[in-house]
Amino acid sequence: MLSRTVFVPLILAFVGVSISAPVSNNNGTDNDESAADQRHIFTVQFNVGTPAPADGDSVTTDGKDSAEKNEAPGDSSDTTEKPGTTDGKDSAEQHGVTTDGKDEAEQHGVTTDGQDSAEKRGEADGAPDKPDTQNGTDDTDSDQETDASHHKTGDSDENKDKPSAEDHTDGNHAGKDSTDSKESPDTTDKPEGPDSDSAPDGDSASAEKTDSDHSPDEDANKSSTEADKDDTSDKDSSQTDEKHDSDASDKDEKHEDKDEKSDEKDSSKDSEDKSQEKSDKSDDGSNSEADEQKESVESKDHDSDSQDSDSAEKKEKHDDKDQDSSDSADSKDSDEDKDKDHSEQKDSEDHEHKEKHTKDKEEHKDSDEGKDDEDKSKSDEHDKDESESKEASKSDESEQEEKKDDKSDSDNSSRDSHSDSDSDSHSDSDSDSHSDSHSDSDSDSHSDSDSDSDSDSDSDSDSDSDSNSRDKDEKKDKSSESRDEDSSDSDSKSNSESSETAEEDTNDDKDSSVEKDKTDSSDSASVEANDSDDEHDDDSKDATPSSEDHTAEKTDEDSHDVSDDDDDIDAHDDEAGVEHGTDEASKPHQEPDHHDDTTHGSDDGRKTSMPIS
């Protein structure tokens, strides 16, 4: 893009200069004016955006009109007059034909050689702040234009005798040469700026720069050393007529040989130097001081730029091979710096964006982890609650089962105790009654005291019958209550089995009791049975209120503990033991469970068996 923006206005400027060259440079004396034109064009080409006018006179620095220069192209005195000159010298004097002009030219060239070289370099280079790629092409263009003008300058004496038409044809021919030589640097694009950077001092640097910049092809580069030699020899010698003759011969034979072309360019350079010196003299009369100061400042700036470019090229040769000057290197460095800064900014922005993205991801991950942890904690709590509720329900169920087992065990134990107490009390009462009756009968038979034996037997039988009746009533009540509880607890199977075993046990007890009764004497047994039956009826009446109280208490306390049953059983057993005088409560109870009331069966058995016996 940079090359496009540079070359498009350059091409337009070249076209404008090539059109205006034969018109404004007919006399060949406004060399400084053409250089100023091109310098002004390239300093304001980006601001104005339009090429210079066709005549090229609107941007002149001397303030003269173009009509004043182009009034009479055939008049040699008008064409050779420099703008701002007050001495009115003719062209021959200005070109050094007279000794005075020659001495002035030599003196001016010797005394102000460095200044003129610096001025010429400043004018040819144009604005020093532009890249040297532009300056190189500008120098070639300006030098080509000045070459064409100085071909006519060398023939200024001949132009006095020639008509204006011939001069115009010569100008057109020179314009064609300038366009031809102008197109060659555009196609080759040879870097020519660095030659001036390696110059050791001001004079040789200026001479080499002018030679290298004004030579568009290889032949001109070969003849640069010859040009230096010719410049020094021309300054030392006063043979100006030979130079003009060589200019004329070069103009006539400029397409014949390459050597002649190089000589022609060398002579044109010499005439350019002289015309430059003369223009400097004429400008000293009016405003040459300001121009010289500006040009000296520009030359100093250009020298400093050249020194800077040397160091820059040494540091950045591998990066700046295609660049022609330090200014272009600086511009490329600035572009590279901008690119680096832009890339660094992009990298920093990308890095910040990545950091933000990673932070957002981390925060999102943390939030997700927090949510997952919360969900996990909630699920764990929920599982714990469920497990606790399950455990609680299981514990409740186990407690209920244990309670049921305890109740069944308590019922079984109570039934066992009842059956044991029944069997024990029954057997004891039987044994006691039989033993007492037997002993009493024996004692009666021996002592013949029937009354005593009867009283003893009656007392013993009364006590035995009372205890038996109480135990029977209590057992009836407990057995009835235990039946109700067992039916509510849905333990029918175990109860039925236990009832079967209990019936078997009671049957065994019945058999044993019947056998025992049979072994006793029939008299004592019959008397005891009658007495016990009579007393049983009386005791049953007395025991009914106590049994009713028992049932009322147990219906009110359905959820009684096993310990209460055990206490009741122990209390009843203790009472029975106290009455009998034996430790029936301390006897082991290991018989199986039963639900049926065995007292009635046993009583019935006794009642039925006794009369039979």
Curated annotation (Swiss-Prot):
Keywords: Secreted, Signal
Source species of the chain: Danio rerio
GO biological process: detection of gravity; egg coat formation; otic placode formation; otolith mineralization; otolith morphogenesis
Note: Otoliths are structures composed of proteins and calcium carbonate that are found in the fish inner ear in contact with the otic epithelium. They are essential for the perception of gravity and acceleration.
Gene Ontology CC: extracellular region
Signal is among the record's keywords: yes
Basic and acidic residues biased stretches: 62-72, 117-132, 147-193, 206-284, 291-449, 467-482, 509-521, 538-554, 574-607
Protein's name according to its UniProt entry: Protein starmaker
Subcellular location(s) per record: Secreted
